[in-house]
């Protein structure tokens, strides 16, 4: 069980709204960061076959869904101290054989993207809130 405060939840929620304000731009930041660190990740996402295209609705849709899952995980942590992931989500990640280092690359890209979205509102406290929510979601996906 993880202690996640009201303030941490509010930090994640407000910065998620900053991300949503320009999903095409921040989707490019996110997926470009992933591919810079792990070019082979391109094979895990069918919508990256032709590179990072901000006009591709699958690219922006997947980014929004992932960031929303982390935001929802923050809410679950605040409410119950645990995150429960959908079994289908776990199954997809297992089928694609997503590794722990790949989860780390995604976390780093997520943090870089949120930092870009919030600008000078970025702080260690904000970073930590996203890290905890993401780490707990990743753990739940691996168990699902």
UniProtKB/Swiss-Prot annotation:
| Any one Gene Ontology cellular component term annotated for this protein | cytosol
In the record, biological process GO terms are: nodulation; response to cobalt ion; response to hydrogen sulfide; response to nitrogen compound
Phosphoserine found at: 46
Induction and repression of expression: Negatively regulated by cobalt (Co) in a dose-dependent manner. Induced by hydrogen sulfide H(2)S. Suppressed by exposure to excess nitrogen (N); this repression is associated with nodule greening and reduced biological nitrogen fixation (BN) efficiency. Induced by iron-based nanomaterial (Fe-NMs).
Q: Where does O2 bind?
A: 62
According to UniProt, the name of this protein is Leghemoglobin 3
Q: Where in the cell is it found?
A: Cytoplasm, Cytosol; Nucleus
Gene Ontology molecular function, alphabetical? heme binding; metal ion binding; oxygen binding; oxygen carrier activity
Keyword Acetylation set for record = yes
Q: Looking at the keywords, is Metal-binding present?
A: yes
Q: Which Gene3D superfamilies match?
A: Globins
Task: Quote the PTM field.
Answer: Nitrated mainly at Tyr-31 and, to a lower extent, at Tyr-26 and Tyr-134, in effective nodules and particularly in hypoxic conditions; this mechanism may play a protective role in the symbiosis by buffering toxic peroxynitrite NO(2)(-). Nitration level decrease during nodule senescence.
* Keyword line: Acetylation, Cytoplasm, Heme, Iron, Metal-binding, Nitration, Nitrogen fixation, Nodulation, Nucleus, Oxygen transport, Phosphoprotein, Transport
Q: Which organism is it from?
A: Glycine max (Soybean)
